[in-house]
Amino acid sequence: MAQDDEDVGLALGLSLGSGGHRRQRESRDEAPSSAAASLLTLRLPAESGGQPQVVVKREVVRAEEEEYEYEYERALYSSSAAAADDDEGCNSRKKLRLSKEQSALLEDRFKEHSTLNPKQKVALAKQLNLRPRQVEVWFQNRRARTKLKQTEVDCELLKRCCETLTEENRRLHRELQQLRALTHSTAAGFFMATTLPVPAATLSICPSCERLATAAAAAGASPTAAADRTNKPTAPHLFSPFAKSAAC
């Protein structure tokens, strides 16, 4: 009796398992790929002790499709933007061809005003049949050329000033060396003149010293001696031109 019950339960379990598996496969085949549906996967692991464990796995198909469409649109937009940038870059790199009248008018306006406000820019662009951006770029380039020319002129002027100052510095250095040599030779000659003995031929008589010596001798001597000294010529007093007397 117990054996019969076990056989019946086993048959029911097998029939239920096979029926669930078949229904799951049919629903999976019938579900469209573009529909947002949840797929249920049933499995009976051996370690669960005979208890069926249901693992639910959600896959949102629409979300995946939307993400794919977003990536595709993004790539398409990036390629179109890159192409537009390339076209704009090519157009911006093209040199602007101006007629003589346009160039003359731009030069006159630049002499009046080196910079333009938006209103002046638009008015000048309409007058020249150009775009405001082209007028702005022309003024920017013209200011850059003017600044470059002024910088070159200033550089040339500074170079000339530097050369002049260098030559003046050399001349002053030569003069300083000459003055130092002259001062050294003069000091050496003066030292030799004061230390060497003076020859007798270079000595001369000091008149004031001679008068003082005569008066002192007359005051201390007798009248006879004074008369004799007066009648007798006195010896000349010699002095050096480098050593002056205090009475002179």
Curated annotation (Swiss-Prot):
UniProt DNA-binding region: 91-150
Compartments in which it is found: Nucleus
Entry keywords, A to Z: DNA-binding, Homeobox, Nucleus, Transcription, Transcription regulation
Transmembrane regions: none
Domain of life: Eukaryota
GO cellular component: nucleus
Tissue specificity annotation: Expressed in seedlings, stems, leaf blades and panicles.
PROSITE patterns named in the record: HOMEOBOX_1, HOMEOBOX_2
Any one Gene Ontology molecular-function term assigned to this protein's record: sequence-specific DNA binding
Entry keyword annotation includes Transcription: yes
Pfam families: HALZ (PF02183), Homeodomain (PF00046)
Database matches in CDD domains: homeodomain (cd00086)
Region Leucine-zipper: start-end pairs: 149-193
Region of interest (Disordered), ranges: 1-44, 223-248
Alphabetical list of InterPro entries matching this protein: HD, HD-ZIP_Homeobox_LZ_Class_II, Homeobox_CS, Homeodomain-like_sf, Leu_zip_homeo
Biased composition range(s): Low complexity: 32-44
Its job: Probable transcription factor.
Family: Belongs to the HD-ZIP homeobox family. Class II subfamily.
Protein name: Homeobox-leucine zipper protein HOX15
Species annotation: Oryza sativa subsp. indica
